[in-house]
């Protein structure tokens, strides 16, 4: 049997990681929608804290089993990541409350240009014309799907601005920390999940009370709602892990662009399970445009020059000196 090429193996693992993220992300959205819309559990920030608490338990079990090796992440780096991640969660919840759904969706779409800017500034990434156009096509398609009424106010704009930048920075930082400190997805989750769980479970109940005027401890817990909360927390383990795996294997921009496939799947699943009137002609048209954009992005970014780091060449005289030095060293070694 012919040996498997390294590139083929990587492509298979990339596809598996991506499918893992899509399945868990769409699954948790459907479960959370049922939990909040049907059973009235509207405490989104506290629920996210429970998600990270469950993820923390998973990392502790994996560490005991030897699947997570000891690793180091400086406290300052952890603190910056937690600030970005928690501002992202809180900012998104506040933005949804203060803005129209249309402006909220536009804010989410603007994460792609912001992520591109971060990669250009910090990683010196250069995008080809086709890659830029394909990203634009995805934005247009998802915009047609999701953006309806668009109204904005000052405090809503500030909340959306904070949410977009903190989310983009958090996703960029996942990729950055894994590269800089040679951390696996499990290692990074082992460092970040406990801190996020602790902070969100402290802040969450107060923030949710401010947003909804309801107390999480006064919620009418029953066997069905507790089952949905448990299911949501269980799926969240896969969602959190797969996000770190995908951003580590790809980049924040690719994660955002291909991530809009989840938006389309959520719309389709929502049509079948919740809102029968939600899927109309302009939504279907937007889906088609977005999918074409994603296919174009995949082809454009994988081509030579589609997305690459800028190479800063040394001056000619400097290169010549280095070449001469290496030649003399080679002759000396031979002698």
UniProtKB/Swiss-Prot annotation:
- Which Pfam families does this one have? TPT
Q: Which residues carry this modification: Phosphoserine?
A: 326, 328
Annotated membrane topology: Multi-pass membrane protein
Any single GO CC term annotated in Swiss-Prot or TrEMBL for this entry: Golgi membrane
The residue ranges crossing the membrane are 11-31, 41-61, 78-98, 102-122, 133-153, 157-177, 186-206, 227-247, 254-274, 278-298
Residue ranges, annotated region (Disordered): 303-335
Top-level lineage group: Eukaryota
Q: Where in the cell is it found?
A: Golgi apparatus membrane
Q: Where does it mainly reside?
A: Golgi
Q: Which UniProt keywords apply?
A: Antiport, Golgi apparatus, Membrane, Phosphoprotein, Sugar transport, Transmembrane, Transmembrane helix, Transport
What residue spans carry the Polar residues bias annotation?
313-326
Q: What one GO molecular function would you report for this record?
A: antiporter activity
Tell me the GO BP annotations in alphabetical order: D-glucose transmembrane transport
Q: What does this protein do?
A: Nucleotide-sugar transporter that transports UDP-rhamnose or UDP-galactose and UMP in a strict counter-exchange mode.
By sequence similarity, the record places it as follows: Belongs to the TPT transporter family. TPT (TC 2.A.7.9) subfamily.
**This chain belongs to which protein, by name?**
UDP-rhamnose/UDP-galactose transporter 5
Q: What is the lineage of its organism?
A: Eukaryota, Viridiplantae, Streptophyta, Embryophyta, Tracheophyta
Name the gene: URGT5
